Design a protein with these regions (language model features):
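Short S/T/G/P-rich N-terminal loop/turn motif that feeds into the first structured element of a domain
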Residues: 1-51, 57-206
Length: 206
């Protein structure tokens, strides 16, 4: 399975309108495309950073959707008041403990490793990091995506609410530090978001 993420530095006053547009207009439009699994959107109201991610059954389906998605993406970016930055990923891990509800939050970590070391990073996340992440209070789900060409990866952990995410911060840092050290990877940034749209629907993959 594959994913396309669109990051927009939004006008903070436009975030609610943008999230509503993604939920009410973008999602129904994308559902008409072959191979779509689902869509999610995360927002950071303090910084204005928003990330929408569409998931696809195959890389071919993701690539085939590019032209049709562009106009939809550009309209969403216009409403949010920012320019879209697009990245493509392979979804290599998806694990859910239970569904998310209103108020759910997500912590993401962007990682970098050598292109030839991506499989080792995936294995470390799957066998060493994920079992510990599952033990965090308020844990809902976790995913891991990679771009093999660039050596980039993104881990995402979803929590029931902001209080659970806040309480997990120090323990999550220890897990992340141990995992990246073991895999010889570096952390590019760590961000925390509100889960504004939750319709990703990616099947279990561990």
């Amino acid at each position: 399975m594959f994913a396309r993420s669109t990051t927009i530095q939004a006008d903070q006053s436009s975030i609610d309108a943008g999230a509503a547009h993604v939920r009410d207009e973008v999602l129904p439009a994308l559902k008409q495309l072959d191979g779509l699994i689902g869509l999610s959107m995360m927002v950071d109201r303090e910084s204005g950073r928003c990330i929408a991610t569409s998931a696809w059954r195959t890389e071919d389906a993701m690539r085939a959707s590019a032209d049709q998605v562009q106009s939809v993406r550009d309209r969403a970016a216009e409403i949010l008041g920012g320019s879209p930055e697009v990245e493509e990923w392979e979804i290599v891990v998806m694990h859910r403990d239970h569904p998310t509800h209103e108020g759910a939050c997500v912590r993401t970590a962007r990682l970098q490793t050598e292109r030839g070391a991506v499989d080792g990073l995936i294995d470390t996340y799957r066998t060493a990091s994920l079992p510990q992440i599952e033990g965090l209070g308020g844990f809902c789900s976790a995913s891991f995506m990679v771009n093999r060409a660039s050596g980039r990866a993104v881990s995402s952990t979803c929590f029931e609410n902001s209080a659970a995410m806040d309480a997990s911060r120090e323990q999550a840092e220890r897990i992340r530090s141990a995992g990246t050290q073991q895999a010889n990877a570096s952390v590019l940034d760590v961000s925390e978001f509100e889960l504004a749209v939750a319709h990703l629907r990616v099947p279990e993959l561990v």
